Every structure is written in structure tokens, then in C-alpha cells.
């Protein structure tokens, strides 16, 4: 477990010293949330909570940390002494990993003294933003493949080792069947996948010898890369020759097939499929890679490409077309002298950047078929009775309303307590269990909300009490109703 305490922006520490010097360490509430889904999609996938937990558990300043901060000539000795005994004492609530999430709802909620809550901002956003981005991208890629296996192959193109390790973790959570990243496999117990490179073929006197040698070594996982020289005139015929020889030796062919990494994948795979089928290898896998993303996979599926397994690298591990997840961390409440929270709101000329005040939680509302109808952000002390009608309304265009009668809906609170007074009270599931949960979550989204282009938006509504509180604060600040 690494100590990432100094993985923070300098201004978090200068603000901490300011709070320390002014004796202002009252308890506050911060919300981490995102304003816009990646890739113009209708949803995102929450990911990274396990690493947030590890970070908080190991949060402390070492002697070397203190010495470095002292060398900056910014911090006074009394503040450095405070840091030398620092540990997290607050509460954390979060939406579990693998959950489908939507804009403006809290993903992580911190309730802690302001110096503690301020310090952890940067690292929490760094972890959640990265893994939620890659998980969301992977979910889109898996959806485009329509049930075919997606393998994460992006390590060499990731923006550094950590991005490769944790990006692969996020990709598997969102639905990838495995990763080429061996260290991720070791760390998180996820399946590792791989075949061979063009260099393997080129290192032998000829393609057939390369294929035969590989098949002799790995008869139970014999996927042969057929595009080193000429896919249809050399690669596929040589692969078929090797498969025939394996069958003649009595080898029970399983997990075998070919991979293409270049060329017109729709044309080549259809031709290769016919060649394999005509030779009696109808169950041979055809795998493809070559700068794939969800849009190209969708196009290839539409064209009838004979691909059943996909290796996706650069465009997945970097989320190349949308390389950042816009998570933010905003103050929602400050504890007053009487021990109650005073709600706070951040104003903006852009209405979507006006925050939701107070101590909040999130409820998921399902229709009678178990599909997501909406999410409802409510104040933490609110409760709901499913035997009563539920009124949902758009928090901006308030005339848009839906009344759900008992029996037409169900609800569940999707935030869970993770830390209580600095102690972790949450057991993180293993990655494959999170993947199973994530698949169940995605199954509650309508296909219209999962489509790649112009998806149907899932509404995130406010409870009446939260809406009224927000309007009251806006009125107090002289703003018109929003």
C-alpha cells in the first residue's frame, strides 16, 4: 500500500495552514460529482473506490514528507508539527464501484474537519476521474460488441504505469473479459490474455514454422496472428495447415483461431471465416485488433464482419476521444456553532454549474420492469414509502412531472457508508464480483440510453425539500429562480 499523502495540489496545503492559523477546523461536507458524461453518453460507471479506501487508510505524513514541506519555506513549524500527527477522522459515503451513475449526483461524500476534507480532494478526484473514465469507455466498447469478448490490450499506449494498471482494472470491471497487463492480473486476480506479435513470425525462417512452433507450445490457446505477410494467401492457409496437423495428432482443439491486426477487417474476416469453415474449423475464433473503438466495432458489426473476439488498446486505455472525466469536488455544508449543518451553494453564470446544497444522498428509482426511471437526489434525512405515490419533476423545467403510483416503482439508496470516524466499515468486493454487479447495473439501462450516438438522457431529479432549499439559497443571494 503506497503512501500518497503528498499526491495533492499545493493550494490544499496552503489552505490547510490557513485554517490551522485561524483556528477554523469545523466539520464540513464536500461532494465529488461529475457534470457531464464522457463521450456524449447518457451514463458513466463509478470506479476507483477501492483505491480511494487504500489512500485514506494510509494517509499520513512521513518524516521525509515533513522535511520536504519544510524545504519549501512556506509552512510554519507549528503547522508541520500538526501534520506529523495527521490522520483522517471523518466519515465517507460513496456509490459502490460498478454502479451506473449520472451527472450532478454525489459519487463520494466527505464529512470531516475542513483541513482533512480539503487535503483529500485532489487524490480522490485523481483516482475516481481516471478509473470512472476508463470504465465508462470500456462499457461503451463492450456494448458495441454485442456480447463478443473484449480484451483490454492498451498497456503500452497508456499514459504511464499507473494508468495502465488501474485502467485495465477499470476496463475489466466494466465488462472486458481480460487484459494483456500481467501486473494487473497479479494485483487484482483478473484474467490475462494474449497471443504473439509479428516479431514472433518474423523471427522464424517462414510463417508456417512460426505457427507450428507456437501451436506445439500452446495447443490449448493457439491464436495465430495471420497478417504478417499476406492474410488470405499466406496467413490463413498456414494457420489452417497447422490446425489440421493438430487435429490429426488427436489434439482436442479449443480456444484456437486467428487474429488480424491490419487491413480491411470486414472484408478479410468474412473471407477468412469462409476459408476456415470450408476446412472444417467452424468453431475457430476470429479475433481482431487495429485501433478499434466502439464506433469502429459497431460499424464492423453492421458490415457483417466475422469477428467474435476483439482486442482494444489505445482508444480504450486512453479514452482517446474524451481523455478526461470532469469530476469536481464542491463544498455543500458547514457545521454551525450549534452542531447543525449550514447548507452552502456555489453560484455561477452557467446554471449547470450551480451546486446542490446540504447533506445529500441518492436514490435510484426503477419502473415496474426493474429498469432505471430516474435518480433522485434527496437530503440525507429524507425517507420514502413505496406504498405512497412518488412525484418526480425536472429541477430546471419544473412543469415536466411524472407521478408514479404504488406498484409502478421501487427505490433503493445507492450511497453506502465507507468510513466512520476514520475507520473503514466497508469491505471492497473483488474485481470479478464488481464486474458481475456492473453487468447487472448496465442491464437496468434502456438500450436507448446505451446507444453510442444521441442516447436518451436519464433524468436526475431533486426531492421537493432539496429543491426548495436550493431555491431559498438562490433567493437569499438575489438570484432568479433556477
Segments the model singles out, each with a brief description of its role:
Residues 1-26, 39-41, 279, 292-482:
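Gly/Ser/Thr/Ala-enriched C-terminal appendages of enzymes
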Residues 92-98, 411-414:
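Short acidic, Pro/Gly- and aromatic-enriched capping/linker segments at domain boundaries
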Residues 67-68, 136-140, 154, 450-457:
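Short coil/turn segments at secondary-structure boundaries
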Residues 149-152, 191-194, 221-224, 256-257, ...:
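Structural motif
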Residues 28-84:
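N-terminal, Lys/Arg-enriched amphipathic/low-complexity engagement segments
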Residues 56, 120, 124-128, 438, ...:
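Short amphipathic C-terminal alpha-helix that caps PH/PH-like domains
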Residues 54-59, 94-97, 101:
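An N-terminal, globular interaction/scaffold subdomain
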Residues 1-27, 36-38, 74, 80-89, ...:
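Buried, small/hydrophobic-residue-enriched core segments of structured protein domains
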Amino acid at each position: 500500500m503506497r503512501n500518497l499523502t503528498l499526491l495533492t495540489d499545493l493550494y490544499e496545503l496552503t489552505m490547510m495552514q490557513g485554517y490551522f492559523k485561524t483556528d477554523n477546523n469545523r466539520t464540513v461536507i464536500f461532494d465529488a460529482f461529475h457534470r457531464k458524461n464522457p463521450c456524449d453518453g447518457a451514463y458513466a460507471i463509478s470506479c476507483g473506490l477501492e483505491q480511494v479506501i487504500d489512500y485514506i487508510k494510509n494517509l499520513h505524513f512521513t518524516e521525509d514528507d515533513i522535511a520536504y514541506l519544510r524545504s519549501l519555506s512556506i509552512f510554519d513549524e507549528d503547522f508541520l508539527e500538526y501534520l506529523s500527527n495527521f490522520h483522517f477522522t471523518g466519515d465517507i459515503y460513496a456509490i459502490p464501484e460498478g454502479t451506473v451513475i449520472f451527472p450532478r449526483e454525489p459519487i463520494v461524500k466527505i464529512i470531516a474537519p475542513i483541513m482533512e476534507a480539503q487535503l483529500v480532494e485532489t487524490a480522490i478526484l485523481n483516482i475516481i476521474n481516471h478509473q470512472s473514465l476508463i470504465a465508462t469507455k470500456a462499457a461503451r466498447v463492450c456494448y458495441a460488441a454485442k456480447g463478443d469478448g473484449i480484451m483490454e490490450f492498451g498497456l503500452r499506449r497508456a499514459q504511464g504505469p499507473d494508468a495502465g494498471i488501474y485502467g485495465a482494472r477499470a476496463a475489466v470491471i466494466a465488462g472486458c473479459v481480460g487484459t494483456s497487463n500481467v501486473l494487473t492480473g497479479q494485483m487484482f486476480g483478473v484474467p490475462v490474455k494474449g497471443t504473439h506479435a509479428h516479431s514472433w513470425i518474423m523471427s522464424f525462417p517462414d510463417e508456417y514454422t512460426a505457427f507450428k512452433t507456437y501451436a506445439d507450445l500452446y495447443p490449448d490457446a493457439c491464436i495465430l496472428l495471420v497478417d504478417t505477410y499476406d492474410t488470405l494467401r499466406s496467413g490463413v492457409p498456414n494457420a489452417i495447415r497447422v490446425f489440421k496437423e493438430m487435429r490429426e495428432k488427436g489434439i482436442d482443439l479449443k480456444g484456437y483461431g486467428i487474429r488480424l491486426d491490419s487491413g480491411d477487417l470486414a472484408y478479410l474476416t468474412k473471407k477468412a471465416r469462409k476459408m476456415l469453415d470450408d476446412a472444417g474449423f467452424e468453431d475457430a475464433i476470429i479475433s481482431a485488433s487495429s485501433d478499434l473503438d466502439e464506433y469502429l466495432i459497431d460499424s464492423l458489426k453492421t458490415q457483417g464482419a466475422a469477428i467474435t473476439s476483439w482486442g482494444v488498446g489505445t482508444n480504450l486505455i486512453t479514452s482517446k476521444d474524451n481523455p478526461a472525466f470532469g469530476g469536481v469536488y464542491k463544498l455543500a455544508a458547514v457545521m454551525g456553532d450549534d452542531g447543525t449543518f449550514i447548507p452552502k451553494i456555489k453560484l455561477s453564470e452557467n446554471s449547470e454549474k450551480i451546486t446542490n446544497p446540504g447533506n445529500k444522498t441518492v436514490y435510484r428509482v426503477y419502473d415496474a420492469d426493474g429498469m432505471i426511471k430516474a435518480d433522485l437526489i434527496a437530503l440525507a434525512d429524507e425517507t420514502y414509502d413505496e406504498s405512497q405515490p412518488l412525484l418526480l419533476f425536472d429541477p430546471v423545467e419544473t412543469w415536466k412531472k411524472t407521478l408514479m403510483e404504488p406498484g409502478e416503482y421501487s427505490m433503493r439508496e445507492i450511497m453506502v457508508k465507507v468510513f466512520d470516524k476514520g475507520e473503514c466499515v466497508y469491505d471492497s468486493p473483488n474485481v470479478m464480483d464488481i464486474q458481475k454487479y456492473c453487468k447487472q447495473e448496465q442491464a437496468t439501462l434502456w438500450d436507448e440510453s446505451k446507444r453510442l450516438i444521441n442516447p436518451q438522457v436519464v433524468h436526475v431529479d431533486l426531492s421537493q425539500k432539496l429543491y426548495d432549499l436550493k431555491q431559498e439559497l438562490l433567493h437569499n443571494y438575489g438570484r432568479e429562480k433556477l
